[in-house]
Design a protein with these regions (language model features):
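Amphipathic alpha-helical dimerization/coiled-coil segments
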Residues: 4, 88-108
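Exposed, interaction-prone assembly regions rather than primary DNA-binding/catalytic cores
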Residues: 4, 17, 46, 53, ...
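Short, cationic-aromatic polyanion-contact patches
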Residues: 18-24, 40, 74-97
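Short amphipathic alpha-helical elements of helix-turn-helix/winged-helix folds
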Residues: 30-35
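Short acidic, hydrophobic short linear motifs in intrinsically disordered regions
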Residues: 37-47
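A short, conserved structural fragment
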Residues: 64-74
Length: 108
């Protein structure tokens, strides 16, 4: 997974706040949707451009609570999550695309 530009997008954060009541959940969901299905919080923070993984802890917990992620054991004491099948991942990508389209329109 490579670095994504929408992690710190004000439009993505605003739409995330509207949809989920939390400004990082949408970008997090999109990054997970684009992954191979196994993700690590530290790697996600780096990919999204966040300084620390602490901003992802509650959104990850909520995704586990919703049954969209399953926490799995990792190597060397690292935590990993497995993405579960759901249309929610495609929905997250659609929302990010909409937010970025509105961002592009606003800058033109």
């Amino acid at each position: 997974m490579s670095s994504v530009s929408y992690g710190l997008s004000p439009q993505v954060q605003e739409l995330s706040e509207i949809m989920f009541g939390q400004r990082h959940r949408l970008a997090l969901m999109a990054a997970i949707a684009q992954s191979d299905g196994i993700v690590n919080p530290s790697e996600l923070a780096d990919i999204l451009g966040f300084r620390a993984q602490s901003s992802l802890q509650m959104p990850l917990k909520r995704l586990v609570d919703a049954g969209l992620l399953t926490r799995i054991s990792g190597l060397e004491g690292r935590v990993y999550y497995r993405r579960e099948d759901s249309h929610a991942w495609a929905f997250a990508l659609e929302l990010v695309a909409r937010a970025l389209t509105s961002e592009d329109a606003a800058t033109q």
